[in-house]
Each structure stands twice: as C-alpha cells, then as structure tokens.
C-alpha cells in the first residue's frame, strides 16, 4: 500500500475522522485544506441506495450551479442550418455536422460538452462508442439533445454539471473551486443535492443517500450528515 505524502499527513491532522460534518462545517473545514499550487476543485461524493443495473433505478441528470463550476467549458454543437447559426450566436466554441463527426472519429475531441439537435442523433450514433466512455454522449436527460440550442449552450457555459450513478451506486461531481466563497460553495452544494433528491427512483427503498463526503482534489474527505442531505428538497 502506498504511503501518504508528508503534505497529506499534515492535512489529515485537520480532519476528524470520527466526526459527521454538517454542510457549513464541512465547507469551512474543506477550505482550510487547500495546499496544492493550483485552484483545487471542491468535490462531492455520494453513495446512493440504488441498483443501476435496473433501468428504473438509474439516477442521471444535470443541474446548473448558481455560482458556476469555476471551469472554462468548451462547448461543441452538432447542428445544421438555422440551428447551427443559433449555436454560433449563443457562443458555442465548435459548430458542425458531418465534418465534426469525422473529427471525432479521428480522435480530435477538443471540447468538454457536446450538444446535438434530435434530428441529427442518428449521425451522432456513429461515434457513440467514442463519446460514451468519455461521458460526453448527448442525452435528453442532461439537456444535451434539444432544439433549444441557445439555452443548452448557455447552461453548459454557466456551470451545468451532469451526473450519473456508476455501477456501484456512486455519484461524484465537482461543485466549484476552493477559491469560491463559503456561501458560493454552500449554495452550489445544496443546489446539487436538491437535484439528486429530485431524481430518487420510485423503486428505491430505504435510505436513498447512504453516505456523502466532501473533499478537494488533493485533500482527505469529510463525512457529511446524510440526514441533512436527505432533508434538502
């Protein structure tokens, strides 16, 4: 087993492993753990009481964080004619159709989010095996398959976070930067959790959020009060 670095061990001294933190305490504490030479991402990790191998227990969606993510997002749009013009006017970084699909097939993926109009999803399907594993395949559930291109581009640029439960029932997401104010991080966190709660499957029995933790890119994690998370509606 790899040993923790001296820096990480120093951070561990600031964290009480036996403590369950409320949101305010967790955000206050996690901001004291910044030690990297870059603006670390504040990360939320959740363990949900779902079994995603069943389609009716898949938790997937998107949410626009009020303070954004602190990350510059490059947006590509697959559209034609008037919708292509709409994408350009909305501020999309890359706009195209067949030629953009060809670039993706070559491995030239110079974007973070891909949006497509519904009528071109047959075209997008040609590169599904490339986009799927990278988590950037357009999907109606994340509002990336839409005719409302202007709003989709705006949301992607302003801090939309897509989430999807993995095979073990976990959801991990970046909800801002450690340089954000405490209030900004708290608002982003509560907005994210509220959206997760809205997506609770009707077939999920028992305690929906089994555990939660807050951390930075390079820090130990803090255990969150799951009851407080569940109460966010």
Curated annotation (Swiss-Prot):
What gene name does this entry carry? rplA
Its job = Binds directly to 23S rRNA. The L1 stalk is quite mobile in the ribosome, and is involved in E site tRNA release.
Stored InterPro entries: Ribosom_uL1_bac-type, Ribosomal_uL1, Ribosomal_uL1-like, Ribosomal_uL1/biogenesis, Ribosomal_uL1_3-a/b-sand, Ribosomal_uL1_CS
Organism in which the protein naturally occurs = Campylobacter hominis (strain ATCC BAA-381 / DSM 21671 / CCUG 45161 / LMG 19568 / NCTC 13146 / CH001A)
Subunit-level organization:
Part of the 50S ribosomal subunit.
Under SUPFAM superfamilies, the record lists:
Ribosomal protein L1 (SSF56808)
Against CDD domains, the record matches this protein to:
Ribosomal_L1
What the entry lists under Pfam families is as follows:
Ribosomal_L1 (PF00687)
Which keywords are on file for this protein?
Repressor, Ribonucleoprotein, Ribosomal protein, RNA-binding, rRNA-binding, Translation regulation, tRNA-binding
Some GO term, biological process aspect, for this entry: which one?
regulation of translation
Full protein name: Large ribosomal subunit protein uL1
The taxonomic lineage of its organism, from the top, reads: Bacteria, Pseudomonadati, Campylobacterota, Epsilonproteobacteria, Campylobacterales
State the similarity comment: Belongs to the universal ribosomal protein uL1 family.
Q: Which HAMAP family match?
A: Ribosomal_uL1_B
């Amino acid at each position: 087993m790899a040993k923790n670095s001296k820096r990480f061990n120093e951070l561990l001294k600031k964290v009480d492993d036996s403590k369950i933190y409320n949101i305010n305490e967790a955000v206050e504490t996690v901001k004291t753990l910044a030690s990297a030479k870059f603006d670390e991402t504040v990360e939320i990790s959740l363990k949900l009481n779902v079994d995603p191998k069943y389609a009716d227990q898949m938790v997937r969606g998107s949410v626009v964080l009020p303070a954004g993510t602190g990350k510059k997002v490059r947006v590509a749009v697959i559209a034609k004619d008037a919708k292509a013009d709409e994408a350009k006017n909305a501020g999309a970084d890359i706009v195209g159709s067949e030629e953009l699909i060809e670039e993706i097939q070559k491995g030239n993926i110079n974007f973070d989010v891909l949006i497509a109009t519904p009528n071109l999803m047959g075209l997008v399907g040609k590169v599904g095996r490339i986009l799927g594993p990278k988590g950037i395949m357009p999907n109606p559930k994340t509002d990336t398959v839409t005719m409302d291109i202007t709003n989709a581009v705006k949301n992607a640029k302003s801090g939309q976070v897509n989430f999807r439960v993995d095979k073990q029932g976990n959801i991990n997401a970046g909800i801002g930067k450690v340089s954000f104010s405490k209030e900004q991080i708290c608002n982003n966190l509560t907005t994210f959790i509220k959206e997760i709660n809205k997506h609770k499957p009707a077939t999920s029995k028992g305690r929906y959020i089994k555990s939660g933790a807050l951390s930075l890119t390079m820090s130990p994690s803090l255990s969150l009060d799951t009851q407080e998370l569940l109460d966010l509606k």
